Amino acid sequence: MTFGLRVLGSYLGLAIITAVVGFGVRALSLGLDIGIIQAVAAHRDATVTSIAEIVTYAGSFPILAPIAVAVVLLRRWNRPADDIALVVIAAGSAALPWLVKLIVARPRPSLEQLQHLSSLSFPSEHTTQAAAIYLTIAIVLSKELGRGLRELVIGLAVVIAVVVAWSRVYLGVHYPTDVAAGLLLGWSWALLVFHWARPSLEPAS
């Protein structure tokens, strides 16, 4: 199977699975989601709010796309298969949540928002992008490192994505289930493309 078909299969498969989960979430989890948002809002602090407003930009595509491009350029096309995979993962991390949002059509939380957004909510686009792109960059850049350092770099990428997810809930623009789905979707997309689709680009040994 070619790289393109594997990417397409991963994209459609994850979109369908996430959409099905999204319909279940809409039907079953609203009370829990609202309870968590209200609990978070009740303990907001001005300093933490300022941090959340900054941290949340780490999941913004206008920030992440140049970072991904810079990684590719700095590597000087050293490993073309890795670089192509990074570009595809970055693009897909924006396109996947967009498609699922259209299908599930879950409105944003209507209370406790610190940033007022009117777009759809499930899954969190910022979280999906952060999960997919930071993990892929970490995998690509840590290939030549020892096991301990490699695990540290990948762990840092995971932490960044989780912090972005937290910021979206803290700011009241996403339900907790939106960001949980975003994390799982982003990581799944990155791992499928990198470890299943990318090897088909490698020269035959």
Label each region the model flagged.
Residues 8-12, 56-75, 83-88, 133-134, 141, 151-158, ...:
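Hydrophobic alpha-helical transmembrane segments
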Residues 47-48, 78-83, 110, 147-152:
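Membrane-helix interface segments
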Residues 4-13, 68-94:
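Interfacial segments of alpha-helical transmembrane regions
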Residues 1-63, 102-114:
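N-terminal transmembrane-helix/juxtamembrane module of multi-pass inner/ER membrane proteins
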Residues 68, 112-205:
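Membrane-embedded catalytic cores of phosphoryl/pyrophosphoryl-handling enzymes
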Residues 19-20, 91-99, 159-169:
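Aromatic-anchored segments of alpha-helical transmembrane domains
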